């Protein structure tokens, strides 16, 4: 706010609004007003004594400055004014010791790293993935076949990050799942629960059946791996071996399966296995085992349900380290536990429904007991990097706890819905690398537990719901974002850190349940010390957002959304779906009076509004109505319609407002009437008049409704999406001071003078169906920043737009091209430039896609030239004025540090693109965000010249080839002086067989040369003729039935064939012989008959 206010208690104290406004470009603000880095303990004690010396222990503006200078803390005027406004939270311009210390405490709390760990969403917020188990019976065992271990030496442990680059789901990193059922069937699954193969298993004979197993190993292979077995008899056995060359699991030639007898292992007949037994470690069956390589300790637990026998003094979990045993005594024993080596804690759960957190080295008493389950605990695990504990009970309820504060964060009960109530014997396994909890039974269910952010897909989210309002506070130099998740978050844009988060800011009770209400509007007070927010249910709240304290509660009409709020000196204006402006007092002593209702001239819901300090207010509705109001009196003076902006519209009260005033008038007349009869008659007459007027209005409404239905599509109203006042433009007839954004993508410009009106309009989008949802400008009203419904950010140069010709200035295009790469020439005219190529004013200087969804709010920081956008895609992003991407608030990636005193952006720095925009970005967006343009000029030659050049080039190539062939003859000898075949090696090559596998890959060790096709010799003519002859061509089947009692040979004389060689005597003799043979056979057959 650039207006000057003498907000003082006495005449000696002058606080001006202009001191915190960014309109003061001449004041040097290189000095920080932060006291926390400059004050010491001795100085703080001196300040305390100075406060005690003053009457009432309160200091004014100049007094506090003198006290600070006495302890060598000196500020210039602008910085000290900013510091005093930060300290003075009571708005009385007097500072006491409590306010001073509170300011220091809140400043130190902002530096607390624990505030950065608080999540915006619930730990389990992703829907579970369910698929069939493909087993005949329920899954009884679930394991993970992994390459990387969960344990690592301390010198190799790196800081775990909360983001990933998308490669953690590979088989090498995430491993394979293995499920088994009671019939001995085993199935192998990928990390995404896709089936791979099926196998069968057989159990070996041990003294007691193994109930639980665990495996501990290091990735480097320098420490012996350990296989831990816990059986039904309470015994624990450990097999240690070296993982070098697969240890004892090397394959032997000729043996497909290696069988090991436990007695031979104990006798040392297998030197690669080192056994160790803990006989009768528990008196009940072992329920869970774990071996910590870091602590060199064994953990084993058991359940003790026989309370009469053990009387609650049972060792639920036993830790064995270097021969020493430590008993963690828990009633009813322990079903499951988890060891977090990084925190040196053990989390246990058992049949007593309690989750206990123990220090590993203090087994006598738990550090914390978490209560809330109604059934026995069957699974617990810890996420040390997120400080969260997960517990699952017998009734399939999952609870998430904070590890440090020991508070309940979430109760997840979807497993009850997904799994049948009769199915209780379930198997659980937590994949620490993928952060997934797998539940196996008749089904396989995968639940994401606080998953990492995929930075190859997104930079993260700012809110857990769409961002509705983005504000920059010039006093505290921070960004405040409000969202539809009912969160208010304070950010430090220079370091990217989150300072304060306030959850459930607007709520209401529905059937005993507290429901969060979306925040739809927000603004600061004139001194920018407090925050005003409006919600969808019509509630308003004033916040001291530095300590998350609500100062005042207000409300317009119930269940009427607040769409715009304005805070001016001593007054608060709120408007929304109630179709009128509600004014609240901001004067001490009159805050809690009834609000003032401005006249209801609007006939539809108010969608937006803005203020020109000291002059007026503009409001716009969903039906396209625009009304200008006097700020001091609250009276309207002009009314427009965006569909017919040049038509004069008379200011008339709405029918609802007229009816309300008429009823108030009759109600006021009734008590002052002379007699009861007169009052009764008057009221009766008033009711008749009301009935007549109501029936007449209903009849008119029906007729109008029929006309509207008949002409629907012709008179569809055009709604107003956003309005913006240019604060630096005067109230004259020739200055366009109000920008009105329509849902058609057009921005209209009006003059808010009493005799002014519509001046001009321009198209602000380049896609059909897009429109401008939010607008902002810089302090000198040189640039207009717009955010569209399709996620585009556009910057317009409006210095010479809608102003008198005498005030127009020269536009230096080379300077603009240096600041905005969008203006540089390209080979082809892009879509954003084609739309405005015939539009002289205003000048489009930048256009790029900043979000995938609609941009709901936009703001601008003047000194560092930073654009802030809040979108419907849950993110709030920072951009330079030229369009370079700086970062997303709440991102898990490292932040590029910025300065509030220097311009953001460096031409030599290569800026990256947001991952989600990179996949859909156009050439214009890629050029603007990256700041790079590849200049490749393309010439367009004449077609005829091109053909001639192609012919000349072809002739030249042919000539060069001929010259290469005939100009220089080949040199003899062509094949060289000699040609020698490669000789054979005199040494035999030794082949080393790989015996580490279960089979010997012989063919991989053989050198096989590629085979060549042999030349096939031609077949001689005689052989070809013999192959072609058919000696059975005369044996043809006999027609009709064949008598089986007769001769076995029935021959039918064939018809005489024409021979190619009729003159050959051999052919004649052969034919005669065949004829004789046929006659002879026939005669013999006849004689026999």
From Swiss-Prot:
Q: Does the keyword Kinase apply?
A: no
The answer on whether this UniProt entry bears the keyword Repeat reads yes
User: Cross-referenced InterPro entries, in alphabetical order?
Assistant: EF-hand-dom_pair (IPR011992), Quino_amine_DH_bsu (IPR011044), WD-EF-hand_domain (IPR051242), WD40/YVTN_repeat-like_dom_sf (IPR015943), WD40_repeat_dom_sf (IPR036322), WD40_rpt (IPR001680)
Q: Locations of Low complexity compositional bias?
A: 672-684
Q: Where are the WD repeats?
A: 155-199, 207-249, 329-368, 372-411, 462-501, 514-553, 601-641, 767-806, 850-889
Renumbered residue ranges of the record's region Disordered: 661-684, 1049-1089
Keywords of the record, alphabetical order, are: Repeat, WD repeat
Any Pfam family from its record, for instance, is: WD40
Tell me what this protein is called: WD repeat-containing protein on Y chromosome
Q: Which organism encodes this protein?
A: Drosophila willistoni
Primary gene name = WDY
């Amino acid at each position: 706010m650039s207006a000057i206010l003498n907000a003082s208690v006495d005449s000696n104290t002058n606080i001006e609004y202009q001191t915190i406004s960014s309109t003061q470009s001449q004041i040097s603000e290189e000095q920080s007003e932060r006291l926390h880095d400059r004050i010491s303990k001795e100085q703080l004690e001196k300040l305390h004594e100075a406060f005690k010396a003053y009457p009432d222990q309160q200091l004014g503006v100049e007094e506090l400055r003198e006290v600070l200078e006495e302890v060598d803390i000196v500020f210039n005027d602008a910085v000290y004014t900013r510091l005093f406004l930060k300290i003075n939270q009571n708005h009385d311009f007097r500072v006491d010791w409590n306010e001073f210390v509170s300011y220091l405490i809140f400043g130190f709390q902002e530096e607390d790293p624990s505030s950065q760990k608080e999540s915006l969403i619930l730990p389990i917020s992703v829907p579970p993935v369910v698929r069939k188990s493909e087993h005949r019976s329920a899954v009884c065992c679930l394991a993970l076949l992994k390459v990387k271990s969960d344990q690592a030496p301390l010198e190799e442990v790196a800081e775990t990050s909360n983001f990933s680059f998308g490669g953690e789901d590979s088989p090498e990193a995430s491993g394979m799942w293995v499920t088994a059922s009671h019939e001995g069937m085993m199935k192998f699954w990928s990390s995404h629960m896709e089936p791979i193969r099926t196998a069968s298993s057989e159990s070996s004979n041990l003294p007691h059946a193994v109930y639980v197993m665990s495996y501990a190993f290091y990735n480097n292979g320098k420490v012996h791996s350990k296989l831990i077995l816990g059986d039904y008899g309470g015994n624990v056995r450990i097999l240690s071996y070296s993982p070098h060359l697969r240890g004892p699991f090397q394959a032997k030639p000729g043996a497909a399966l290696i069988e090991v007898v436990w007695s031979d292992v104990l006798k040392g007949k297998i030197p690669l296995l080192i056994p160790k037994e803990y006989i009768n470690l528990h008196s009940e069956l072992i329920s869970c085992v774990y071996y910590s390589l870091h602590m060199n300790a064994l953990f084993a637990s058991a359940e003790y349900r026989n309370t009469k026998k053990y009387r609650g003094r049972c060792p639920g979990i036993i830790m064995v380290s270097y021969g020493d045993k430590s008993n963690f005594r828990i009633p009813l024993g322990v079903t499951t536990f988890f060891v977090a080596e990084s925190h040196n804690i053990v989390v246990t759960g058992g049949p007593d429904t309690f989750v206990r957190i123990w220090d590993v080295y203090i087994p006598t008493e738990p550090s914390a007991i978490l209560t809330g389950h109604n059934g026995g605990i069957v699974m617990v695990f810890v996420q040390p990097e997120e400080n969260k504990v997960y517990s699952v009970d017998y009734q399939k309820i999952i609870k998430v706890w904070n590890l440090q504060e020991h508070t309940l964060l979430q109760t997840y009960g979807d497993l009850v819905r997904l799994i049948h109530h009769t199915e209780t014997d379930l198997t659980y396994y937590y994949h620490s690398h993928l952060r997934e909890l797998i539940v196996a039974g008749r089904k396989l269910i995968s639940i994401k537990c606080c998953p990492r952010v995929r930075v190859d897909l997104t930079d993260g989210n700012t809110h857990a719901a769409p961002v509705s309002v983005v504000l920059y506070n010039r006093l505290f130099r921070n960004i405040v974002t409000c969202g539809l998740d009912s969160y208010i978050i304070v950010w430090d844009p220079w370091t990217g850190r989150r300072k304060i988060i306030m959850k459930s800011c607007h709520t209401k009770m529905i059937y005993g349940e507290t429901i969060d209400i979306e925040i739809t509007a927000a603004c600061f007070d004139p001194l920018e010390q407090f925050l005003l927010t409006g919600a969808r249910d019509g509630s308003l709240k004033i916040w001291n957002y530095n300590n998350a304290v609500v100062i005042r509660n207000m409300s317009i009409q119930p269940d009427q959304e607040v769409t715009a709020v304005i805070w001016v000196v001593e007054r608060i204006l709120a408007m929304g779906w109630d179709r009128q402006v509600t004014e609240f007092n901001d004067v001490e002593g009159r805050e809690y009076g009834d609000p003032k209702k401005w006249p209801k001239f609007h006939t539809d819901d108010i969608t937006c509004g803005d203020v020109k300090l000291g002059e007026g207010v503009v409001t716009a509705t969903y039906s396209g109505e625009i009304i200008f109001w006097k700020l001091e009196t609250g009276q309207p003076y002009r009314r427009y319609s965006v569909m017919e902006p040049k038509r004069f519209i008379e200011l008339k009260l709405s029918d609802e407002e007229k009816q309300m005033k008429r009823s108030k008038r009759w109600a006021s007349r009734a008590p002052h009437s002379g007699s009861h009869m007169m009052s009764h008659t008057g009221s009766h007459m008033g009711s008749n008049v009301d009935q007549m007027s109501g029936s007449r209005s209903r009849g008119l409404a029906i007729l109008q409704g029929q006309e509207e239905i008949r002409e629907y599509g012709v008179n569809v109203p055009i709604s107003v999406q956003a309005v913006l006042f240019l604060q630096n433009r005067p109230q004259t007839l020739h200055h366009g001071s109000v920008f009105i954004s329509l849902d058609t993508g057009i921005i209209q410009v009006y003059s808010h003078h009493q005799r002014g009106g519509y001046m001009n309009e321009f198209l602000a989008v380049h896609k059909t169906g897009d429109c401008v949802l939010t607008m902002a400008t810089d302090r000198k009203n040189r640039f207009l920043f717009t955010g569209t419904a399709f996620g585009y950010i556009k910057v317009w140069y409006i210095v010479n737009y809608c102003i008198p010709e005498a005030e127009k200035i020269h536009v230096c295009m080379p300077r603009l091209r240096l600041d905005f790469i969008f203006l540089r020439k390209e080979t082809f005219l892009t879509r954003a430039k084609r739309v405005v190529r015939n539009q002289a004013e205003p000048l489009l200087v930048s256009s790029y896609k900043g979000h995938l969804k609609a941009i709901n709010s936009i703001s601008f920081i003047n000194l560092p030239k930073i654009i802030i956008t809040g979108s419907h895609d849950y993110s709030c992003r920072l951009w330079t004025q030229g369009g370079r991407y700086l970062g997303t608030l709440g991102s898990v990636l490292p932040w590029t540090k910025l300065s509030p005193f220097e311009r953001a952006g460096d031409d030599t720095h290569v800026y990256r693109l947001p991952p989600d925009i990179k996949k859909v970005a156009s050439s214009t967006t890629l050029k603007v965000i990256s700041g790079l343009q590849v200049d490749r000029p393309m010439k367009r030659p004449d077609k005829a010249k091109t053909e001639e050049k192609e012919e000349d080039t072809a002739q030249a190539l042919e000539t060069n080839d001929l010259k290469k062939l005939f100009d220089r003859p080949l040199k003899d000898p062509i094949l060289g002086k000699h040609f020698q075949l490669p000789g054979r090696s005199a040494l035999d090559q030794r082949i080393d067989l790989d015996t580490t596998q279960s089979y010997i890959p012989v063919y991989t060790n053989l050198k096989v040369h590629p085979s060549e096709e042999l030349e096939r010799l031609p077949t001689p003519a005689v052989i070809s003729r013999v192959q072609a002859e058919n000696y059975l061509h005369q044996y043809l089947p006999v027609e009709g039935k064949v008598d089986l009692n007769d001769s076995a040979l029935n021959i039918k004389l064939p018809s005489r064939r024409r021979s190619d060689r009729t003159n050959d005597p051999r052919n004649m003799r052969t034919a005669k012989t065949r004829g004789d043979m046929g006659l002879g056979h026939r005669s013999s057959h006849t004689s026999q008959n």
